């Protein structure tokens, strides 16, 4: 692989855990920061050697020490160490002319504001570490916003029905506008983008929240998900149909203000985007296995002089070291499959197939929109 863009973040595991309950957490932090800085210097040399690769450093999400939960006592001081690590990342980004995206402070601020109302609120799962679905969605929002995508609509259509005119169309094509004597408005609509489908179902291990809940804490819909249809010059109520499917009913006043089609989950274009979303989740599930395999190789086996040995001896070594690393048990089953090159090749081909299919399905289609007077 020769990526043109690389994003890099670290800090949660590097900042330690149970050591903050030990006899001398201050000494631990000093040792750990020296180790992190030394390793990061080596990382920077590698990244700088790839002149044609754009680097984006990410300040990772916080460890939520302030969430009130009697069953999970926090490691006090851990988040301060994470913040020290993020300062190293930010300084390196400035020095090397790399981009920097901050997840840490915006997530910390949402937790602060919401916990002032309810101390049991958190964007994390029950471990104070991993963001729940709404936290992950906020991370996606902050990343996309940092790329300058805020304020760019999915599409916008502005029609004056009384004058039978398309006043404006942004990021889309509008043709064949007709206004009948009975008050029906119809036209063809080809957007250049699809709406962003935010899952309203809690998915994933230990997840209790949904992606859509993130809209309560940031203007995601307003900034990134505007597919606006505005029609002026109407009276009464109108049924919106897209490709013959009844979507909803709106008053002339609502249509004059503009309705956000991206907020309607039953439109054909939204359902088209949902298909892409689910395919991408499958791609991510497979791609995650390669990351876990790489962790096992470089964090465990490389230290044993068995990097990419991928044989029974390597497997025996991993089993013998299960007690030395709390994360290894969770990766062992994945390694037992990915140690075979045929498995890695098959899964890599699946990723390529899923990506190709995603791009095929994601192509916007010409839709027929009708507003039928009731």
Label every model-predicted segment.
Residues 1-137, 141-374:
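Alpha-helical cap/lid subdomain in secreted, periplasmic
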């Amino acid at each position: 692989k020769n990526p043109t863009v690389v994003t890099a973040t670290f800090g949660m595991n590097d900042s330690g855990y149970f050591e903050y309950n030990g006899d001398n957490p201050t000494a631990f932090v000093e040792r750990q920061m020296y180790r992190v800085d030394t390793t990061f210097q080596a990382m920077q040399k590698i990244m700088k050697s790839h002149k044609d690769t754009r680097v984006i450093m990410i300040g990772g999400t916080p460890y939520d020490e302030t969430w009130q939960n009697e069953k999970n006592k926090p490691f006090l001081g851990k988040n301060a160490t994470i913040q020290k690590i993020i300062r190293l990342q930010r300084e390196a980004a400035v020095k090397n002319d790399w981009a920097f995206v901050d997840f840490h402070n915006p997530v910390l601020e949402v937790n602060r504001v919401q916990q002032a109302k309810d101390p049991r609120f958190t964007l994390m799962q029950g471990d104070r570490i991993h963001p729940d679905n709404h936290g992950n969605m906020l991370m996606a929002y902050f990343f996309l916003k940092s790329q300058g995508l805020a304020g760019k609509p999915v599409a916008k259509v502005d029609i004056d029905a009384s004058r039978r005119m398309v006043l404006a169309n942004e990021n889309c094509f509008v043709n064949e506008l007709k206004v009948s004597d009975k008050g029906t408005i119809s036209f063809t609509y080809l957007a250049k983008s699809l709406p962003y489908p935010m899952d309203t179902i809690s998915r994933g291990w230990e997840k209790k929240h949904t992606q859509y809940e993130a809209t309560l804490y940031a203007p995601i819909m307003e900034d990134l998900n505007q597919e606006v249809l505005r029609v002026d010059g109407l009276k009464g109520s109108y049924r919106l149909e897209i490709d013959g499917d009844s979507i909803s009913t709106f008053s002339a006043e609502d249509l004059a203000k503009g309705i956000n089609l991206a907020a309607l989950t039953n439109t054909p274009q939204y359902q088209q985007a949902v298909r892409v979303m689910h395919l991408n989740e499958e791609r991510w599930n497979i791609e995650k296995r390669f990351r876990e395999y790489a962790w096992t190789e470089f964090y465990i086996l490389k230290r044993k002089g068995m990097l990419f040995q991928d044989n029974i001896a390597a497997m025996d070594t991993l089993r013998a070291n299960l007690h030395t690393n709390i994360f290894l048990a969770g990766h062992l089953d994945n390694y037992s499959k990915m140690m075979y090159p045929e498995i890695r090749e098959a899964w890599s081909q699946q990723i390529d197939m899923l990506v190709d299919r995603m791009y095929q399905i994601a192509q916007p289609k010409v839709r027929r929109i009708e507003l039928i007077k009731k």
